[in-house]
Amino acid sequence: MWRIKIAEGGNNPYIYSTNNFQGRQIWVFDPNAGTPEEQAEVEEARQNFWKNRFQVKPNSDLLWQLQFLREKNFKQKIPKVKVEDGEEITSEIAAAALRRSVHLFSALQASDGHWCAENGGLLFFLPPLVFAVYITGHLNTVFSPEHRKEILRYIYCHQNEDGGWGIHIEGHSTMFCTVLNYICMRILGEARDGGIENACERGRKWILDHGGATGISSWGKTWLSILGVYEWDGTNPMPPEFWAFPSSFPLHPAKMFCYCRITYMPMSYLYGKRFVGPITPLILQIREEIYNEPYNKIKWNSVRHLCAKEDNYFPHPTIQKLLWDALYTFSEPLFSRWPFNKLREKALKITMDHIHYEDHNSRYITIGCVEKPLCMLACWIEDPHGEAFKKHLARIADYIWVGEDGIKMQSFGSQTWDTSLALQALIASDLSHEIGPTLKQGHVFTKNSQATENPSGDFRKMFRHISKGAWTFSDKDQGWQVSDCTAESLKCCLLFSMMPPEIVGEKMEPEKVYDSVNVILSLQSQNGGFTAWEPARAGSWMEWLNPVEFMEDLVVEHEYVECTSSAIQALVLFKKLYPRHRNKEIENCIINAAQFIENIQEPDGSWYGNWGICFSYGTWFALKGLAAAGRTYENCSAIRKGVDFLLKSQRDDGGWAESYLSCPKKVYVPFEGNRSNLVQTAWAMMGLIYGGQAKRDPMPLHRAAKLLINSQTDLGDFPQQELTGAFMRNCMLHYALFRNTFPIWALAEYRRHVLFPSAGFGFGFTNNL
């Protein structure tokens, strides 16, 4: 039986931590764990998911929840409530519904104070990790038979009815993910026509019917070349020499978005080495299975730019293709010959130095799941028996997640982000007298998860930004500062500082608060908006270089409405509590940030959400940020337009439901069907509350609250529905905790501001700056 372990490093000499592994969550298989009843409960969850996999594609993340509730012997004691048609929602009904969810949510807190959750749903995350451990000869040591069984379960569960796999679990089939998952099944032991319901045969048929694997997108071409089932001559150049150029060079990686930079760092190393893994009998078989012509007859140079239409969300512009052609024709032959091959050797060393630096400063977690197997493989190529590779192996467990739909690879964990939102939802409930220990533990976790140092050495030379005082998206060890994670965690600490210490613990030291504010301020751009990870270092013109066909806006850092809103909220509250610290600078920062939010509003009154689906998410953040900055419905046309957008998109059942297609299409697309999405309903509901809807006409809020209350389960949680997370326009994420966090938060705000409208928003002040 699978069990999750919290804040454990084990006895592995190759793993280390900056904060005693707080926030770390790893899964282990214990064949002796669980009673027959508990094992049956898990199996029932698996079977229920399988039967309904085409209706609700994200899993409910039940395995760890079943474990926690058993360990804490949680029983729901508060009776379920229901609002009948024509019935008024009383404070007693709202309080009962809220208390049911809050008590359950508190029982789901981990022992170190954070909340666990899956953060995944992308179907290109896991196969490269399997490829990497296969190439290095560690497949059987990293993945036990139980691991392999659950990985295959996940692949089977998320195969589309047409036989292919999408970029994400709700997406249409693509060549990229179908080829990757087909090969993954073969490596894990399935025969060419094997798998549940002939998964391999159906997957291969999809590949061949859509032109074969030569049409795989660029990341796929890279991984297939590494694996030995494609040729490097069929990929566009990724010269490591770019890392050897002065950072003033217009196309230097230092100017790129951190994820783009650190993905292409090991890719360029592998490309420069022309590395190919062992050509095993299985690799030779796969070569003959995924193409429509014999492998040795393929003209690799002619397929460099080929991309299946299903994958080609961001077609390469002609000027980009000309650049790749020039590099392929002129520079690559040059760097393979003396004396220029000496320059390549130097560039490879510089690139490897950067890989080691990033590995060290993330405790070998790396910045994310795309980069992890690439960096690990580069370290193995340099020294198969070296410490760096062994440290990478020790951190694979940080990425593995087990649900009722099988084993998947996390993006890299959302522990800090999820916890900061969960704590704010619980604080808003005004039930601190009932859940004091939960709040205290969460407060301790948040304080202990703050970064206390910048990256090591001359970090600016390594193109890194300050991190001292920041919070990451996952845990402290991962090390990468994020503006909104910092702002939301700082808000938690500031809110706790206003509460009785005997309930929530001692407040954070002022110097650490100042460090956090310093990080937030450092990430504001000249246009007033806030970036996520690093300051914007280049203009948007560089996006024409985007080599990734299925994503957009990933070459350089951009400003985001969500990050800007979070920063405003944190700084407004900080300014109230610490009015003398950088007062004028913070005041100007808030003014410019609020203006940025107004400036990027869509003509229909909405805001595009970058990290959630989509206009519902962005509009909630925008309205909350503007309200924090002192804007009101009466004095701000942007708020009036935003409120109007939300009211117009409310559905007959009182809720909201937006399709994930809004993200790639960049226009509001309603969800097909009659059912509303409860998480999006919570976002819209809170957006209306911050827009002052309660005092004008509370009926839309009553209708939304009725839907949330009546959707609550017998246990006290809320049902899993469609995906709600997003990134890079075309990739959707499963934030499994959101199904509880946001309905709780919305009901809490409804109870405070609609049923008891005298309550303030908690921003510190609401007058105009």
Curated annotation (Swiss-Prot):
Residue stretches in coiled coil: none
GO cellular component: lipid droplet
Chain positions of PFTB repeats: 148-189, 513-558, 590-630, 639-680
Domain of life: Eukaryota
Pfam families documented for this protein: SQHop_cyclase_C, SQHop_cyclase_N
Keywords attached to this entry: Isomerase, Repeat
Any one GO BP annotation for this protein: pentacyclic triterpenoid biosynthetic process
EC annotation from Swiss-Prot or TrEMBL: 5.4.99.41
Catalytic residues (UniProt): D484 (proton donor)
Reactions it catalyzes: (S)-2,3-epoxysqualene = lupeol
Tissue expression pattern: Expressed in stems and laves of glaucous individuals. Not expressed neither in stems or leaves of the glossy phenotype, nor in roots of both phenotypes.
Catalytic class of the enzyme: isomerase
MF annotations from Gene Ontology: lupeol synthase activity
Recorded family membership: Belongs to the terpene cyclase/mutase family.
Note: Lupeol forms probably the thread-shaped epicuticular wax crystals that hamper insect adhesion and can prevent herbivores from climbing vertical plant structures, a phenomenon known as the 'greasy pole syndrome'.
Known role: Oxidosqualene cyclase involved in the biosynthesis of the cuticular lupeol of glaucous individuals, but not of the glossy phenotype.
Matches recorded under NCBIfam families: squalene_cyclas (TIGR01787)
Protein name in UniProt: Lupeol synthase
Organism: Ricinus communis
